[in-house]
Amino acid sequence: MAPSVTIKTVAQAVGVSPSTVSNAYNKPGQLSGALRDRILAKAQELGYAGPDASARALRSGKAGAVGVLFTDKLAYAFSDPYAVGFLAGLAEVAEEFVTSLLLMPLSSSDIEGGANAVRQASIDGAAIFCVATGHPGLDMLGKRGIPTVSTARDADPKSSWVAIDEQEAAAKLGHHLARLGHSDLVVLVDNTEAPGSRPVELTFDEVGCNDCEWRIRGLQRELPGARIRLVSGGANAFSSGLRGAELVLDSQDRPTAIIGLSDVQALGAMEAMKTRRLVPGRDLTVVGFDDIPAAETAGLTTIRQPIKDKGRTVGRVLLDPEFTEHQVLLPTELIVRSSSGPAPH
């Protein structure tokens, strides 16, 4: 059996110390370009296990990966229909440019750990997907000079984003509900700080999600005289919508309409109605946001946004040198189905 090639083998072949070989990979700035290239070439010639990917990265100055940052657990990226659609679109473009995706969940309970993860990540760019405003991980990206594209609009003309007009989209829902005569509403809000098993009412200041805040403002604009309560059953999930709806449906102060700020929460609310033998659109209106595939099956009135196209466009802004736009506003559409109806008298 041939002896394994180690860092010492490479060092002896080049005539340098093992630490110098290590610097060629970890601290390239400490070596001259000629020496670094000589070490990398010899390592590849000897078949040193491990230098190939690092050598390519050093020569090109590219990590070959884009980070996807989101404030939730890792499982969210694989279970939430909106996240799955967005990542599918982003992955199509990443594959075209031979780039990997690095999923980076930034836990709201471990702020420092999230910032450290961003500090250490080997990425060429970052897609900011559903990250809490002000998270230190975002500041760390700026300090590292890593290009970013957000899915939230930013007033800074130098920022890059691919987004919808959250307020105008929600205003379409609000206008629809106002025409149906609704004036007592509950909004189901995702909130990772809320208890996992007990739904709670929130104030506007407790929402903590920039997109959610704009959607609530859009509803308020079209329903100026309405009573609008905010309820959270936890993070953005079917179970959270179920818990939040159960709280209001079992109270003596039942609203005439429930608005899920995502379809998954609205679908959870419809399940809560089903177990109480209530019919959406007749006994109580339920509407959502996103138009995921399950929304059509359930007959859910919602706002359609181009989820997969959003992911594709984020990928273009990050990776495609021929794509010159850096701020892209995507269209939305009100989709009316059977879950919305006139307010009961």
List PLM regions with ranges.
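Periplasmic-binding protein-like
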Residues: I123-F129, V186-L188, L230-V231, R254-S262, ...
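Short acidic/polar active-site loop segments enriched in Thr and Asp
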Residues: S17, G64, D124, H182-D184, ...
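Flexible loop/turn connectors
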Residues: L242, E246, S251-H345
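Glycine-rich phosphate-binding loop signature in dinucleotide/nucleotide-binding domains
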Residues: L46, L180-H182, V248-R254
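Alpha-helical recognition/docking segments in bacterial nutrient-uptake
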Residues: M1-T6, T20, A65-V68, K73-A178
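N-terminal helix-turn-helix DNA-binding module of bacterial transcription factors
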Residues: M1-G64
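Hinge/beta->alpha junction and helix N-cap segments in small-molecule ligand-binding domains
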Residues: K73-V84, M104-I111, V162-K172, V187-G244, ...
